[in-house]
UniProtKB/Swiss-Prot annotation:
The keyword Ion transport does not apply. InterPro entries: CEP15-like (IPR028006). This is Centrosomal protein 15. GO terms for cellular component: cilium. It comes from the Eukaryota. Keywords: Cell projection. The keyword NADP does not apply. Pfam families: CEP15-like (PF15134). May play a role in ciliary assembly. It is found in: Cell projection, Cilium. Its main location: other.
Length: 127
C-alpha cells in the first residue's frame, strides 16, 4: 500500500509539473502571437505610410516634369503658327491628287514636264 501511495504522490507531482509546463507554454504562445500581431500591425502601418509617401513623390515628379516641359517648349510665335496652318492646308489640298497617283489611277500630279521623269504606267499599277 505504501508503494501505491508513493506512486500516487509521484504521479501527482508529475501532473503538477506537466500542468505548469502547459501553462508556461500557453503563456509563451500567447506572447508570441501577441508579438506577431503587433509586428504585423506595425508592418501594415509602415507599408501604408510608404505607399502614401510614394504617391506624393510620384505626384511631385509628375508636377516637376510638367513644369520642366512647359519651360522647355516655348509657345510658338504667331508667324510660325500661321506658317504651320498654311502648310497643313496645302498638304490637305494636294492629298487627293497624290493619292490617285500612288494608287495608279492618275498621272504624275505636278506639271507636264515632270511626267517624263516619272512615267505613268497604268498596266504596272494594276498588276
Amino acid at each position: 500500500m505504501a508503494s501505491l501511495f508513493t506512486q500516487e504522490i509521484h504521479l501527482s507531482k508529475r501532473h503538477e509539473e506537466i500542468l505548469s509546463q502547459r501553462l508556461m507554454l500557453l503563456q509563451k504562445m500567447k506572447n508570441k502571437f501577441g508579438d506577431e500581431n503587433t509586428e504585423r500591425a506595425s508592418l501594415l502601418q509602415a507599408t501604408e505610410t510608404a505607399s502614401r509617401r510614394n504617391l506624393r513623390l510620384l505626384k511631385d515628379i509628375d508636377a516637376a516634369e510638367e513644369a520642366f516641359q512647359t519651360k522647355l517648349i516655348p509657345h510658338p510665335q504667331p508667324s510660325m503658327l500661321s506658317l504651320e496652318t498654311r502648310y497643313w492646308a496645302s498638304v490637305e489640298e494636294h492629298i487627293p491628287k497624290w493619292e490617285l497617283f500612288l494608287l495608279g489611277r492618275a498621272p504624275y500630279p505636278i506639271g507636264a514636264e515632270n511626267q517624263n521623269e516619272v512615267p505613268f504606267v497604268q498596266t504596272e499599277a494594276k498588276l
